[in-house]
């Protein structure tokens, strides 16, 4: 059985062209989503996937109607293949029921994986180059090393943490991370009380 799936794009909010192509291709049932592909919750696609059984074929007008990204698309088609369901894209001439269609999809998967690895490699190389130039990624530190040391001295003098946090305009939790409280245990009636110092 051929099951169709249509989804609007951000440019074209009309699915008539897709629907007509799927009807001409022989789809007996067509499921539709009227939302952008970036949304993860697509009830029409979920219903189509539930309806599909072993030996069926999921048909779309174009690849980008099904997947949000190449990685998502390859994952979805892999799940279909595991369930014994074929996939067909009309405008891209992809049909995983044929050996050539399966080969083409494997090549696409390998290219997507290679692209992902290249992005990771370039990112890591860029970060290493920045570190070698003395740049550290992320937000600049709130306080200098000298300011943190001064905050520690104020705490050692007995100034309350809340007051020190206000003076340096830092969160109390940040102050605790930089200068953890010293704990003293006092035994009292078989309980242990902890007192911050």
Curated annotation (Swiss-Prot):
Any one GO cellular component localisation term in the record: host cell cytoplasm
Q: Does the keyword Nucleus apply?
A: no
Q: State the Gene Ontology BP annotations.
A: DNA integration
Highest taxon, organism lineage: Viruses
Q: Spell out the coiled coil positions from the record.
A: none
Classification from the root reads: Viruses, Duplodnaviria, Heunggongvirae, Uroviricota, Caudoviricetes
Which molecular-function annotations from GO does this UniProt entry contain? DNA binding; DNA strand exchange activity; hydrolase activity; ligase activity
Every copy of the Resolvase/invertase-type recombinase catalytic domain together lies at 1-134
The record, for InterPro entries, names:
Homeodomain-like_sf, Recombinase_CS, Resolv_N, Resolvase-like_N_sf, Resolvase_HTH_dom, SSR_resolvase
DNA-binding region, as residue ranges, is located at 138-181
For this entry, the protein name equals Serine recombinase gin
- Cited SMART domains: Resolvase
Q: How does the record comment on the protein's domains? A: The dimerization region is in the N-terminus.
Stated EC number for the protein is 3.1.22.-, 6.5.1.-
Primary location class: host cell
Summarize subunit and interaction data from the UniProt record for this chain: Homodimer. During inversion, two dimers associate to form a homotetramer.
- Induction summary: Expressed in the late phase of the viral replicative cycle. Expression of late genes is activated by the viral late transcription activator C.
Q: Name one Pfam family in it.
A: Resolvase
- The active site annotation covers 9 (o-(5'-phospho-dna)-serine intermediate)
């Amino acid at each position: 059985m051929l099951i169709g799936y249509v989804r609007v794009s951000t440019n074209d909010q009309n699915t008539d062209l897709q629907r007509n192509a799927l009807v001409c291709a022989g789809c007996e049932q067509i499921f539709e989503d009227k939302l952008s592909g970036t949304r993860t919750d697509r009830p029409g696609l979920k219903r189509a996937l539930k309806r599909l059984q072993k030996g069926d074929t999921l048909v779309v007008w174009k690849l980008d109607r099904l997947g949000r990204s190449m990685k998502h698309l390859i994952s979805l088609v892999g799940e279909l293949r595991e369930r014994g369901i074929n996939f067909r894209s009309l405008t891209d001439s992809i049909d995983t029921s044929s050996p050539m269609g399966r080969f083409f999809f494997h090549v696409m998967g390998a290219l997507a994986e290679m692209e992902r690895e290249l992005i990771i490699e370039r990112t890591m190389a860029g970060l290493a180059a920045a570190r070698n130039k003395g740049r550290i990624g992320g937000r600049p530190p709130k306080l200098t090393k000298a300011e943190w040391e001064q905050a520690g001295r104020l705490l050692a003098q007995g100034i309350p943490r809340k007051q020190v946090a206000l003076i340096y305009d830092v969160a109390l939790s940040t102050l605790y991370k930089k200068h953890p409280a010293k704990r003293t245990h006092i035994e009292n009636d078989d309980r242990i009380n902890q007192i911050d110092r």
